[in-house]
Amino acid sequence: MKGLLTSLITVLTFTGLQAQSLPTAPKLVVGLTIDQLRTDYLEAFSSLYGERGFKRLWKEGRVFHNAEYTFSGVDRASAMAAIYSGSTPSVNGIISNRWMDVATLRPVNSTDDAAFMGYYTDQTCAPTKLLTSTIADELKIATQGKGIVYAIAPFCDAAIFAAGHAGNGAFWINPTTGKWSGTTYYGEFPWWASQYNDRQAIDSRISSVTWEPVFPRGMYTFLPDWRDVVFKYKFDDDRNNKFRRFITSPFVNDEVNALAEEAIGKGSVGMDDITDLLALTYYAGNYAHKSVQECAMEIQDT
């Protein structure tokens, strides 16, 4: 499972906060995590990148060529917890997305907590099973609680573990309704997120969304053993899990960006001299959980 999540988190900026004088501290630290972006994909598609994205990170950033998780059975929940806490499951408690509770002999979800209600969702989520401090928590301590921390992701576990225990909010897309969701654990749902749900959420636009190849067929040669079939997907069928399929398409990354812009423009993120954290998770996995051979063209576009 090496390379399940490729982390591009810029944590080195944060670790030097206490050693710097306040005026030199960054106003905003942005954490970028890309779910299922494998290292071989990152290299295979390199000729398609623009100069201000991955190429800039490769040239100007710190690249760790042999990084890997030091535990087995890596999935999204355990990987996110490891990335943001800097610890392994034996320490942070998040061994998987789901596991068997030894006390009840029932399966439990890594983010389940019935003590907290959901906003725009019936999920009851909180980071209470995460046993260690996170980057977000340490930022809150360093700024005496004044730094703003928001985490935005397609999935609940990715948002919750990135926001940590002390974050101001964690937001993920409800796979049933398409609305951005949250939990009462972090307090009130921000007005700007509610406004986005009411006016611009994907549920009001999804019937007009169509996904077709970005490039001519001849440019889809980067993955071996791919099926040469041009695809076309629409998301207007309520009977076919349209929001769940949408979340595994590249369009979900546009939604993450859109809510991030709302957080910056209306949520006061990065607006003062106190360092804030905006943790964003994107999706680069297989569409509708198909095999690589079935959706190689889709993976390249994503």
Which residues does each predicted region cover?
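Beta-strand elements within well-structured catalytic alpha/beta cores of enzymes
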Residues: P26-R38, L57, I83, L139, ...
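Bacterial Sec-dependent N-terminal signal peptides
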Residues: M1-T24
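Short, structured active-site-proximal loop/turn typified by the sulfatase FGly-forming signature C/S-X-P-X-R
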Residues: L42-V91, I148-I152
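His/Asp/Glu-rich, glycine-adjacent segments
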Residues: S87-T88, G93-I274, Y283-A288
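Generic, well-ordered alpha-helical scaffold segments in large soluble proteins
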Residues: G3, S7, D40, E60, ...
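Second-shell loop/turn segments in exported
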Residues: R38-A44, Y69, T121-P127, F243-P250, ...
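Short secondary-structure boundary/capping segments
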Residues: F45-Y49, G164-T176, V292-Q300
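Stable alpha-helical elements in mature extracytoplasmic
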Residues: T33, L37-Y41, G50-F54, R76-M80, ...
